[in-house]
Amino acid sequence: LVEDNKGKAILNYGVMGGQYQPVGQVHVLNSILDFNMSPQQAISSPRAFHFNNIYKLEKEISKEIKDGLSKIGHNTQYIEETHGGGQAIKIDRKNGNLIGGSDPRKDGYAEGY
């Protein structure tokens, strides 16, 4: 649960995925709050995860980004499996809306009332 500076809830979300989970939590939160993505955009966006000295990249990440990481010394690898899964609901108090997103990598849905 994320609150605004007045203590009002503005976002409820969660990301699963073992060792990816803390990275996924930050990824989604950063995408929504700092890059103004919708919950669906944030949860659906391609993921990268550094594990065992390898940047494991979902195949939707461009070759240009992969090559750029390699150029500065990172070991990179495209993977077939996905990183985590999650759901989120953003609370738009101004318009009285709940804006949900659910990860297409897993089954599930975002539901609020």
Segments predicted by a language model, with ranges:
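Proteins synthesized as precursors that undergo proteolytic processing into mature forms
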Residues: 1-79
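Terminal-appendage/accessory-domain detector
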Residues: 37-38, 54, 64-113
